[in-house]
């Protein structure tokens, strides 16, 4: 079946058509890349060819075929010389000198029909799709193991909704009543200052590690209606998991850049997820466990820390 659905991209929402197959999770890997792209400005595109090169996952003998050639190659089944080292190919019979040279270098060239070439191209596409999924969708897979919904939905839904589903499931499991929703009020947000305009050299960047989640955990900023402490326990677990991935990314940065980038990509969805608890907490008209005073305490504490930096 096919139905209209929505993809949550940081602060934006994009409509798309979701294909569903009973008993399966149908995932479009480009959605995972788009979600990472929304918070990582170094990712300039979401296409498979670009993103595979971006994560250094492209095979040296990767076969590329222009989309206009796929049909003719497969239907005509003409012969090609395939370079097994770099994936490039030449049509047999165009130049006799090329044919002679390729026939002698059996260690580099092999003769292959167009339909087999197309199959190799499609196999490479599938292999790269799996590699991209391993890089960008593991955070969603981790969340899907805990949240009472499908992996398919977790891969596209907003993070505030995930917290709501987690707490609803927790309450149902432990026989807890759902708190009454409250009304939303205005409060002072984060600290923002522009001290200089223009071009600067020797810029020093200072950053807090997971500022809002850390404030909640260190200062115990959680609503009283969470009588079992579920929000604190889950936030602590996900924050520690993200820090572990960040530390592993730093540890392997000089010795194994590929592994370092893999851990870096895995921590991105978790970063969004743990930071979104503040958003959920500050929206009591939507999130039943929200508390405006708790949200205001988090931003107030954050401003104080920034002034002391």
Residue ranges of predicted features:
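Charged, low-complexity interaction regions
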Residues: 253-257
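Hydrophobic residues within well-ordered, non-membrane alpha-helices that form the packing/core
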Residues: 33, 52, 56, 133, ...
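Non-transmembrane amphipathic alpha-helical segments
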Residues: 235-252, 270
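Active-site-proximal helix-loop-helix substrate-binding element of RNase H-like nuclease domains
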Residues: 1-126
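Common nucleic-acid-contacting/processivity interface regions adjacent to the catalytic cores
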Residues: 71-219, 260-308
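Cytochrome P450 catalytic domain signature, combining two hallmark sequence patches
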Residues: 220-229
